[in-house]
């Protein structure tokens, strides 16, 4: 089997769903998996998601995660003050604390916090740029620290292919229906977050993997 590459969007604590999707993919150690951030919050098992990623990395799988805005919010809740903590809790942080059996984010196991603290904001290949949300094309270097907020929070969907070497951008963050995801595969911006944690929304509620070589979508319904 030739080497394959996949990208998976926002997981949001849906550990069982992630593990089932990985099983369906039949991921081999010669494959590469890009994870687009937002591993935690809202769903039932944020701890299980992080444990799955760390275990696979330890076992030698080529897992390449990036940072999402929810990891950023958790870290800000630890580093900053009460306002940041309340904001994170309002965005699903309570579910993360519950999954760890703790009452404060700083009580999350150190290896898991280290994982989140060391996540890059983007990754790239000769064909794709992977980022959680988007890029700010109004600044000289969209990948610089000045573009941090856009990489984590951007929702416009704007892409200027010439500014990224004619490559396609792959992101999560903004939930799309399956039809919208499929239609977007023809564009320069591949948005693959199907809102896994929202199974009640029409056209959403699945965890989606994009096969980067073929453009095929592998869709796993939310099972928790």
Language-model features, listed with the residues they occupy:
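N-terminal active-site segment of His-dependent metallophosphoesterases
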Residues: 1-52
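Active-site-proximal beta-strand elements of phosphoester/diester hydrolases
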Residues: 5-12, 128-134, 190-192
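Divalent metal-coordination and catalytic microenvironments
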Residues: 10, 38, 53, 68-69, ...
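Active-site environment of divalent metal-dependent phosphoester hydrolases
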Residues: 12-16, 41-44, 72-75, 137-138, ...
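Active-site neighborhood of divalent metal-dependent phosphoester bond hydrolases
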Residues: 42-124, 151-160
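His/acidic metal-ligating clusters that form di-metal
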Residues: 108-179
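Conserved beta-sheet core of the metallophosphoesterase superfamily
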Residues: 147-220
């Amino acid at each position: 089997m030739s080497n394959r590459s996949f990208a998976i969007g926002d997981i949001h604590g849906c550990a069982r769903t992630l593990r089932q999707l990985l099983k369906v993919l039949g991921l081999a150690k010669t494959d590469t998996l890009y994870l687009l951030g937002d591993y935690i919050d809202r769903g039932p098992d944020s701890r299980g998601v992080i444990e799955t990623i760390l275990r696979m990395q330890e076992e030698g799988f080529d897992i390449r995660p990036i940072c999402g805005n929810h990891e950023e919010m958790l870290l800000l809740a630890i580093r900053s003050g009460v306002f940041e903590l309340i904001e994170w809790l309002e965005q699903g942080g309570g579910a993360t604390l519950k999954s760890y059996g703790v009452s404060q984010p700083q009580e999350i196991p150190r290896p898991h916090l280290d994982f989140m603290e060391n996540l890059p904001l983007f990754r790239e290949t000769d064909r794709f740029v992977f980022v959680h949300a988007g890029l700010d094309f109004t600044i000289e270097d969209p990948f610089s620290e000045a573009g941090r907020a856009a990489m984590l929070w951007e929702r416009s969907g704007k892409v200027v292919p010439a500014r990224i070497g004619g490559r396609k951008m792959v992101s999560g963050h903004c939930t799309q229906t399956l039809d919208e995801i499929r239609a977007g595969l023809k564009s320069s911006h591949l948005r693959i977050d199907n809102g896994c944690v929202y199974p009640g929304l029409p056209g959403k509620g699945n965890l989606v993997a994009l096969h980067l070589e073929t453009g095929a979508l592998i869709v796993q319904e939310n099972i928790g």
